[in-house]
Amino acid sequence: MAGKPVLHYFNARGRMECIRWLLAAAGVEFEEKFIQSPEDLEKLKKDGNLMFDQVPMVEIDGMKLAQTRAILNYIATKYDLYGKDMKERALIDMYSEGILDLTEMIGQLVLCPPDQREAKTALAKDRTKNRYLPAFEKVLKSHGQDYLVGNRLTRVDIHLLEVLLYVEEFDASLLTPFPLLKAFKSRISSLPNVKKFLQPGSQRKPPMDAKQIQEARKAFKIQ
């Protein structure tokens, strides 16, 4: 029997968090090996474990997969979370890219220089409220199902829930005008595997704090 997937990243959300979410939603147990120093990262590189000398990297089914989208696609396909046909997969990909844009826009605020933070925060709030959330509210209304694509859970439902929780952390009032998204958040959060991942003590990571930012900058040699 194959062992658990092993996730290589630092002990924070970053680009690995959506992978953690997807594995958890699929009911897959996984291990994590945290990068805590530049030496940890260099060892992975020198041992030939990182195809492009970067993380995230996931060991799964005898492979060492790099690149977030490739990892997500493999997990979604393996655990039947990638739609039933090409049209559904195209919608899943399109929606996922928009969700990724929103996730990165919010996530990068913590790294923003102080003199730019106010302007970028205002821009992020504007785009969240007037571009991204209305788009997904419209999808839920027009599709008329419990899920974004088709009539069963797919990876994009998990990605959307994740970013809705980030939006809630960022500014909970941004969700107020979107009743279908609020209902979606409650519905997907209640799924057994997701509910378990949302409980204290899971491998879900909290928002990055100043200490984690400093550790990440050190590990990745970011000035």
Curated annotation (Swiss-Prot):
> Which is one Gene Ontology cellular component term of this protein?
mitochondrion
Q: What does this protein do?
A: Glutathione S-transferase that catalyzes the nucleophilic attack of the sulfur atom of glutathione on the electrophilic groups of a wide range of exogenous and endogenous compounds. Involved in the formation of glutathione conjugates of both prostaglandin A2 (PGA2) and prostaglandin J2 (PGJ2). It also catalyzes the isomerization of D5-androstene-3,17-dione (AD) into D4-androstene-3,17-dione and may therefore play an important role in hormone biosynthesis.
Organs and tissues of expression:
Expressed in the liver, skin and kidney.
Q: Which Gene Ontology BP terms does the record give?
A: glutathione derivative biosynthetic process; glutathione metabolic process; prostaglandin metabolic process; response to bacterium; response to caloric restriction; response to stilbenoid
Entry protein name:
Glutathione S-transferase A1
Binding of glutathione occurs at Y9, K45, Q54, V55, Q67, T68
Q: N6-succinyllysine: which positions carry it?
A: K4
Q: One Pfam family of this protein, by short name?
A: GST_N
Q: Which residues form a coiled coil?
A: none
Q: N-acetylmethionine: which positions carry it?
A: M1
| Highest taxon listed in the record's lineage | Eukaryota
Q: Which reaction does it catalyse?
A: RX + glutathione = an S-substituted glutathione + a halide anion + H(+); prostaglandin A2 + glutathione = prostaglandin A2-S-(R)-glutathione; prostaglandin J2 + glutathione = prostaglandin J2-S-(R)-glutathione; (13S)-hydroperoxy-(9Z,11E)-octadecadienoate + 2 glutathione = (13S)-hydroxy-(9Z,11E)-octadecadienoate + glutathione disulfide + H2O
Entry EC no(s): 2.5.1.18, 1.11.1.-, 5.3.3.-
Give the similarity note.
Belongs to the GST superfamily. Alpha family.
Q: Which SUPFAM superfamilies match?
A: GST C-terminal domain-like, Thioredoxin-like
Residues annotated with N-acetylalanine modification: A2
Alphabetically, the GO molecular function entries are: glutathione transferase activity; peroxidase activity; steroid Delta-isomerase activity
Can you state the subunit structure given in the record?
Answer: Homodimer.
Q: Which PANTHER family match?
A: GLUTATHIONE S-TRANSFERASE (PTHR11571), GLUTATHIONE S-TRANSFERASE-RELATED (PTHR11571:SF233)
Keywords assigned: Acetylation, Isomerase, Lipid metabolism, Oxidoreductase, Peroxidase, Transferase
Indicate the segments forming the GST C-terminal domain, all copies. 85-208
